Amino acid sequence: MHTPENRPALTPGLTLVRLPHGEGLDLPAYETAGAAGMDLRAALPADEPMTIRPGERALVPTGFIFEIPAGHEGQIRPRSGLAFKHGITCLNTPGTVDSDYRGEVKVLLVNLGAEDFAVERGMRIAQMVIAPVTRLAIREAGGATTTARGAGGFGSTGTK
């Protein structure tokens, strides 16, 4: 358990812009002291839940614009409880929110379960992890260097 003396410090610098349909929703938040991702909530009308049928996907608004600091990205990831209990997960995972993107963050959900799933206003639907970005100089070569592994992939190292 984290006490105020040993709780990890939050790094300042994430600015959010609340959109009109995000009014009244809690800010994205880290639900525990050790959480890596902040939970994102559905910014749907209270009287219009969204039903995602098995095999269907839906784009769910969060009601916020995130001003991700330069040199970082926001990674949209599924919530494990929704995936395990209902088969609800995020497509394009992790989805990347670039630091220069200034539109509303939306979450692309898919229902891999057997039952319809209702997304309601304020429901925690995904999480966002803020991570540093490394950009490399890109150059073309005439051939690849040799390694012990070579071009082996897709199970080439075995399972045991």
UniProtKB/Swiss-Prot annotation:
Keywords: Hydrolase, Magnesium, Metal-binding, Nucleotide metabolism. Gene3D superfamilies: 2.70.40.10. It is an enzyme of class 3 (hydrolase). One of its GO terms (biological process) is dUMP biosynthetic process. Pathway: Pyrimidine metabolism; dUMP biosynthesis; dUMP from dCTP (dUTP route): step 2/2. Its EC number is 3.6.1.23. Substrate binds at R79, S80, G81, N92, T96, V97, D98, K106. InterPro entries: dUTPase (IPR008181), dUTPase-like (IPR029054), dUTPase-like_sf (IPR036157), dUTPase_trimeric (IPR033704). It catalyses: dUTP + H2O = dUMP + diphosphate + H(+). One of its GO terms (molecular function) is magnesium ion binding. Coiled coil: none annotated. Its cofactor is Mg(2+). This enzyme is involved in nucleotide metabolism: it produces dUMP, the immediate precursor of thymidine nucleotides and it decreases the intracellular concentration of dUTP so that uracil cannot be incorporated into DNA. NCBIfam families: dut, PRK00601.1. Belongs to the dUTPase family. This is Deoxyuridine 5'-triphosphate nucleotidohydrolase. It comes from Rhizobium meliloti (strain 1021). The lineage of its organism: Bacteria, Pseudomonadati, Pseudomonadota, Alphaproteobacteria, Hyphomicrobiales.
